[in-house]
Design a protein with these regions (language model features):
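Exposed alpha-helical structural elements
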Residues: 32, 63, 122, 126, ...
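Activity-critical C-terminal alpha-helical subdomain
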Residues: 92-165
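Acidic, glycine-rich catalytic loops of TOPRIM or P-loop NTPase phosphate-binding modules used
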Residues: 2-86
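Domain-length accessory/inserted modules outside core catalytic folds
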Residues: 69-80, 141, 201-208
C-alpha cells in the first residue's frame, strides 16, 4: 500500500507497517508522486499494506527536519526519500533534516545519495517542461479550464510571457487546480523520459518496493 496526504505521526499508521517514507513539500507534490507510484505498478490502498510506502506532505521545506526526525524515531529501520525545490535554500534544509533524522551525508555528497531529489524550480515546472506547453494545454482543455487560461494569458501582467511561465503561474493560482493537474500531468508522462528528479525517485521507489 502507498498512503498519501498523512502525517508520518498519523495514529492510523499500522505499527511497523511503513518501510519507506516519501517526503515532499506540498499536497500537489504528494498527488504527483502518488500518480507516479500507480504508474510504476505499486499497489495503492487505504487500509492494507503491500509495498509499505507512505507519501507525506511536510507542509513546506522548513518542516522537513521535524517530520523526518519524528518518523525516524518511530521507524528507525525505514528508508527515507523525497523531492524538494531548490528555491529558498532547499538543499540546506534537506541536509539539516537528514542530520535530524540521523542520516548523515558527507559535505561533498548531494542529498541524492540519501534519496532526496531536487526540482530546479518546483515539480510543476519540471512536469510542464517534460510534457511541453501543448500537452499541458490539452489537459486544461479536458478539464474545461482552457478558456480561463486564455483569459489569464490576456491579462496585462502575463501578456508576452513565455507560455511555459504562464502555465506555471496559472496552475498555481488555485490549490485545488494545482493538485488535480499535478496528477493528470504525471499520468501523461512517458516513463522512459521522466524529469530528472522524478526518474531518480521512481528508481528509488521501485528498489524499495521490490517490484521489477
Amino acid at each position: 500500500m502507498i498512503r498519501a496526504h498523512e502525517s508520518p505521526h498519523s495514529p492510523h499508521m499500522p505499527e511497523g507497517g511503513i518501510r519507506t517514507l516519501v517526503l515532499v513539500e506540498g499536497p500537489s507534490d504528494a498527488a504527483a508522486v502518488r500518480a507516479l507510484a500507480t504508474r510504476l505498478g505499486l499497489e495503492m490502498g487505504l487500509d492494507t499494506t503491500l509495498h509499505h510506502i507512505q507519501i507525506s506532505s511536510a507542509g513546506g521545506i522548513t518542516n522537513f527536519s521535524q517530520v523526518l526526525a519524528g518518523f525516524a524515531r518511530a521507524h528507525p529501520s525505514a528508508r527515507l526519500c523525497g523531492l524538494y525545490d531548490t528555491a529558498v535554500g532547499g538543499e540546506r534544509h534537506v541536509r539539516r533534516a537528514l542530520t535530524a533524522a540521523a542520516t548523515r551525508i558527507a559535505a561533498h555528497q548531494s542529498p541524492e545519495s540519501a534519496g532526496f531529489f531536487a526540482c530546479v524550480a518546483d515539480l510543476e515546472d519540471e512536469l510542464i517542461r517534460a510534457l511541453g506547453a501543448q500537452a499541458v494545454e490539452r489537459v486544461l482543455e479536458e478539464q474545461g479550464e482552457l478558456p480561463s487560461f486564455r483569459r489569464f494569458q490576456a491579462m496585462p501582467e502575463h501578456r508576452g510571457s513565455p507560455v511555459h511561465r504562464q502555465l506555471h503561474r496559472f496552475l498555481g493560482t488555485r490549490a485545488t487546480r494545482k493538485i488535480r493537474c499535478a496528477k493528470l500531468l504525471v499520468e501523461r508522462l512517458d516513463l522512459a523520459k521522466l524529469p530528472r528528479p522524478f526518474a531518480g525517485l521512481a528508481n528509488h521507489l521501485v528498489k524499495a518496493s521490490g517490484v521489477g
